[in-house]
Amino acid sequence: MVKNSYPSRRQAKKQTNWFLVISGVLTAILLVTAGLYSVFGVSRTVQQTNGSSVTKSSKQATDATQSKDAKGLPDVSPKDWQLLLVNRDNKSKELNPEIADVDGVSVDARIAKNVKEFLAAAQEIDPSYHLISGYRSVAYQTELYNSYVQQEMAADPSLTESQAEKKVQTYSQPPGASEHQTGLAIDMSTVDSLNEADPDTVAKVKELAPKYGFVLRFPDGKTSSTGVGYEDWHFRYVGKESAEYMTEHNLTLEEYLALLKEKSK
């Protein structure tokens, strides 16, 4: 209907001054053009402004998150003695720590009290929990490692020494690469076999470990970070603050130290 009404209106105004008509049309065109520019120009400006605002907000949120993470990290240094990193990429010579005896196992004297309390707490969960191993000298680790290699070759004569070593390294470290030589690591379990403790019991002990400054050193799913498969018996002392932070954020010692080093830059 709207489309058909225009011809009738023009016919009714045949006597109109064409100069006035043309002038009116030009004026209307100018007004429409100005209006369109105003609408779309403002729209583009709003979009650009909003885009800048979103980008700025996103950056601020990222910065805030990074700041929050940095602030959340304990006030410790990656060079602190309790955070000493020993692994295949960070081998160490004999460290000769001052050791103390806890339930027949040697540990760094500085953590003896923590080990006693942690063991007692674990035994409240399951009385069969006991210490299996603590401090080992590099010389002893050499003997242990070589004995494992020989055992693997005896069990499977087709293995070369190199192949046997690779197999052993899934559960034992080469001399100089074992953190047992720090005196800060303990093997503690309800059994003496590998990964055969009750998973629910291990989970409970893992949960209370930070209270005494310990973390499960080689958790499940973190082999790419630690280079070692899951070990339900191997606990490492890192200090209470660090242990709580690492456990809360599911961090290995390698990942935690990387954050601390980034923070200190």
Q: What positions do the PLM features span?
A:
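Extracytoplasmic cell-surface/polysaccharide-interacting catalytic and binding patches
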Residues: 2-265
